[in-house]
From Swiss-Prot:
Its EC number is 4.2.1.8. One of its GO terms (biological process) is D-glucuronate catabolic process. Its cofactor is Fe(2+); Mn(2+). It catalyses: D-mannonate = 2-dehydro-3-deoxy-D-gluconate + H2O. This is Mannonate dehydratase. The gene is uxuA. It holds the Pfam family UxuA. Keywords: Iron, Lyase, Manganese. GO terms for molecular function: ferrous iron binding; manganese ion binding; mannonate dehydratase activity. Belongs to the mannonate dehydratase family. The keyword Heme does not apply. Catalyzes the dehydration of D-mannonate. NCBIfam families: PRK03906.1 (NF003027), uxuA (TIGR00695). Pathway: Carbohydrate metabolism; pentose and glucuronate interconversion.
Length: 397
């Protein structure tokens, strides 16, 4: 696997020197300063590449080229935004980058309710609390029809949770959910968020699939022409939230995506932490089934709690993800590719990480502190090395 590291650009508290010292050789980044829907100029892409090259690093994967909401809703100026997206892909390929990660989650990117969940050892993790989220939907956002998405017991628990909240608690929870986490290009106020939600009235899973299919039929031919591998990131969490459909959550969704535009350039980001939240997602089976379409991997683990929809981020070798078996399946796919002459390793980044040691006293992007990811990268690197020497001696070390 190619060891990569996500970097949020010049304002990221984690520097390029830090990344190099972590042992990563590739960087996963994006032009976050360019608004959604605007074409990325070649000059801007090359400028970012030059910044990385100055530190002996390469831009391995673009994560992400955000998809404008008009495309997802198939409304407004969607056709122009698709044309802009196509041109951005051409410009990325012109600069020699061949992998683009993206997602098709409506409105929100990845979602958490607690960004500082304290673990028994004193480190901090990200957490999604189903009851806290219900309290937000039912009593803060007051989304019409939200009660249909929760059991009677969850509604009682959510009301008790809300009644115990202070104004500061309400503001913090609201900000955690809708203000935008790292990688999300847009944040909202409550009123703005309600307006956005209303734009999805009448858009169910079938309609969102149709909208995504229209997008894929427009951009995958461009990816084929310029040699780009598109890698869709799964929903996080992998289920409908806020009354919004989610369509990249299960192996059935992966099969639908493959069949919709059957091209090797229409591929996946295997995010084990996103898919792994669902106990019914067999990660190894996903890799074995769609191995040739997996163009990028995010390796992390989560821990499901008493309510099966509540989870927190676990250590990379702990929690509900069998990282040993996952890495072995990825290396098996790499071996298959190399036997066919494709020598490029699959890019991997250690996804998220606990806030720990002196990072507890620093400004960090939630989930993206340096030391927690350094620990995760070292652990995954160790698993990979042991597997290679035991089962895959012919793979490049």
């Amino acid at each position: 696997m190619e060891q990569t590291w996500r970097w949020y650009g010049p304002n990221d508290p984690v520097s390029l020197d830090d990344i190099r010292q972590a042992g990563a050789t590739g960087v996963v980044t994006a032009l976050h300063h360019i608004p959604n829907g605007v074409v990325w100029p070649v000059s801007e892409i090359k400028q970012r590449q030059a910044e990385l090259a100055a530190k002996n690093l390469v831009w391995s994967v673009v994560e992400s080229v955000p998809i404008h909401e008009d495309i997802k809703t198939h409304s407004g100026n969607y056709q122009q935004y698709i044309e802009n997206y196509q041109q951005t892909l051409r410009n990325i390929a012109e600069c020699g980058i061949d992998t683009v990660c993206y997602n098709f989650m409506p409105i929100l990117d990845w979602t958490r309710t607690d960004l500082e969940y304290e673990l028994p050892d004193g480190s901090k993790a990200l957490r999604f609390d189903q009851i806290a989220f219900a309290a937000f939907e039912l009593h803060i956002l007051k989304r019409p029809g939200a009660s249909n998405d929760y059991t009677a017991e969850e509604q009682v628990q959510a009301e008790a949770y809300f009644n115990a909240m202070t104004e500061a608690d309400i503001a913090k929870l609201t900000g955690n959910i809708i203000a935008g986490l790292p990688g999300a290009e847009e944040g909202y106020t409550l009123d703005q968020f309600r307006v956005r939600l209303a734009e999805y009235d009448g858009i169910d899973k079938a309609q969102l699939r149709e909208n995504m299919a229209y997008f894929l039929r427009a951009i995958i031919p461009v990816a084929e022409q310029v040699g780009l591998r598109m890698a869709v990131h799964p929903d996080d969490p992998p289920r409908p939230i806020l009354g919004l459909p989610r369509i990249v959550s299960t192996i059935e969704d992966m099969q639908w995506l493959k069949e919709t535009v059957d091209s090797i350039h229409n591929g996946f980001t295997m995010c084990t932490g996103s898919y792994g939240v669902r106990a019914d997602n067999d990660l190894v089976k996903m890799i074995e089934t769609f191995g040739d379409r997996i163009h990028f991997t995010h390796l992390r683990s989560t821990c499901r709690e008493g309510n099966p929809k509540t989870f927190h981020e676990g250590g990379h070798l702990q929690g509900d993800v069998d990282m040993y078996s996952v890495v072995k399946a990825i290396l098996t796919e790499e071996q298959r590719r190399q036997s066919l002459g494709d020598m490029r390793p699959i890019p991997m980044r250690p996804d998220h990480g606990h806030q720990m040691l002196d990072d507890l006293h620093k400004k960090t992007n939630p989930g993206y502190s340096a030391i927690g990811r350094l620990k995760g990268l070292a652990e995954v690197r160790g698993v990979e090395l042991a597997l290679k020497r035991t089962f895959f001696p012919e793979l490049k070390q």
